[in-house]
Amino acid sequence: MAEKKRPNVVLIMTDNQPADLLGCYGNQEMRSPRLDQMAAEGIRFDNAYCPNAMCSPSRASVWTGRMPSQHGVHTWLDDRLMDQWPAGWNAVAEFDTLPEILKRAGYATAMIGKYHLGALAEAQNGIDHWITMARGHTLDFHGNEMTVNGESFVYDGHSVDFFTEQAVQYIDARAAQPDEPFLLLLPYNGPYGHWPSIKGRAEHRFGDLYDETPMHSVPREGISKEAIALYEMNKEFMSSKKGGPDFSALLQIPNDLTSLRNYYSQMSLIDDGVGQVLDALARGGLEGDTVVIFTADHGFSLGHHGFWGHGQATWPSNMFRIAYNIPLIVRAPGAIGPDRSSERLVGSMDLYSTILEYLGLFEETDMADVPARSFAPELAGETFDWDDVVFLEQEESRAIRTTEWLYVKRFKGSGAYPLEDDLYDLNADADERRNLAGDEGYAAIERELATRLDAYFDRYADPRFDLWRGGSAKSNASRPWLWKDAWGPDW
C-alpha cells in the first residue's frame, strides 16, 4: 500500500500586528471578513505570544524553534549593514530549519514575501521557489525591488498584492501536481504600522474604507516616560542625521488619524489577500488537504501604555501583552473542527514543533536543544498535558508569563544604565498597570518566577549569543551602548 500523502502547509505571517487588530479577536472597527471566516472554520488561539517583539528574531524563532539567545538574532537585521555581511549570509544557516526538514521529507518549498533573515538575492534554507523584497523593512508599500528566483525588478504596485498574486500562482501550479505535498511560507510585509509607509492616505483599493471610522479602538493615552526615554536615548545614538530612524514618529503617530486609518486599511488589504489564497486552494481541490496557519511576527502597541510600536519602542524594552500577543488561527477542513478557540498559552516559536508533529516529522531532526513545544494535540481536540507558560526576551529584558503573572527581569550588569524589574498580577490587573516588583508582599512569587526564568535561560541560552553573559548578536544589536558599557568598548 502506498504511503499516505502528508498534508500541504500554508504559513501566513503578517508584519507588526497585534491580535487586537482583527474582528475575530474583538476589534469592532476592523474589517477582516476573510480572517474572521477562517477563524470560524478552524481554531483561534487567544493567548499566543511571540518570543521577541522584533521582526528578525521572531521569524528566526519560528523557523528554528529556538529563542534569540540560542539563534543569535536579537533585533531587526539592519538593511544598512547588508554590504558588510558575507556573500549569501544566512542568519540561521547552522540550524535545521522548518523548510529544510520538510524538503527532506519530499515537500516542495516556497517562500513568498518578507524574509529579513539575511542575504536576499538567492534562496536560503531549503527553499525551492524564492520570492522576496530587496530589503527587510518597509519604507513604502509601492515601488519595491523584488527578487523572483534570482531575477530582480521593481514592482510598481502594492507589495501585498504582489505577494498575494505570486502565492495564488504558486498554488495554481501545485494543484497540477496534487501528489506532491508543498510548504508555502507567505510572510506579508504589512500592515507594518511605521512611518513613512503608513503616513498619509493609503493608496490601494481599501484606502477609503476607514474614512468614517472614529478609531476608538486606538487608545488615546498620554505618551509614556519610557517612550520619551527611548526618543531621548536615540537622539544621541541613532539620530536621523546619522542615517537612523526618526524616533519622533513614535510619539506622533497615535494622534494622526490619517495614519491610523492607513494602518487599518493595510490589514484589510491583507485580509483580502488571505481570502484569495483560500479561494485558490478551494479552486484547485487542495482545501481539504491543506493546513493553513495565520499569525504575525509580533504584536504592536496602538497607543496602549502610552507608546506606539513593538517591544523596543520604549526604554527599557517593554514586555506588555499588546506587543507580544499575536493572532494565531489554524484551519484544516476535515482535520480540525470548526468554530473553536483555545485559551492555552502558546508561542509562535512552538509552531516549529507543532507543524513537525502534525505532519509526523517530529523524529526527523534533533530536538534535544529545541525549547519549542508541540501543541498539535490541541488542533485535534485531544486531551494532553500543557504547562501554561511562555518565555520572552528583548535584549536587556527577559520575562516569564503565566496565566496569573507577568514577571520581567532586566539586565543588571551596567553601571551607566540601571534597570528595574516588573511584576504584574494578571488576575487583579489584566491591563498590566501596577508594578509590584520590590513589594515585600509579593517577594515570594517574585523569587519563584525569577528562579524559573533563570533556569530556562541557563538551559537554553547559547554562550555565544547570551548578551547577559557577554555574548554577541548576529549583525547588530539595538542597545549597543548598554552592552559596551557592560562588557567593554570592544563588545
What are these regions (language model features)?
Residues M1-P7, T14, P18-A19, R44, ...:
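Long, internal low-complexity/basic segments
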Residues K5-D20, Q37-A39, V62, L102, ...:
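Beta-strand elements within well-structured catalytic alpha/beta cores of enzymes
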Residues P7, L11-T14, P18-A110, R135-T138, ...:
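Active-site segment of extracytoplasmic enzymes that catalyze sulfate/phosphate-ester chemistry
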Residues T14, C24-E29, I43-M67, H74, ...:
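Short, solvent-exposed turn/loop segments enriched in Gly/Ser/Thr/Pro and often Arg
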Residues W63, G136-F153, G275-D279, R283, ...:
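Substrate-binding rim/cap in mid-to-C-terminal beta-strand-loop elements of soluble/periplasmic
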Residues H74-R104, A108, H116-L260, Y264, ...:
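Formylglycine-dependent
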Residues A123, D128-H129, A134-H137, F300-G311, ...:
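C-terminal cap/loop subdomain of S1 sulfatases and analogous C-terminal strand-loop tails that border
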Residues A123-G126, M133, H194-R201, D279-I336, ...:
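Histidine-centered active-site microenvironments of extracellular/periplasmic hydrolases
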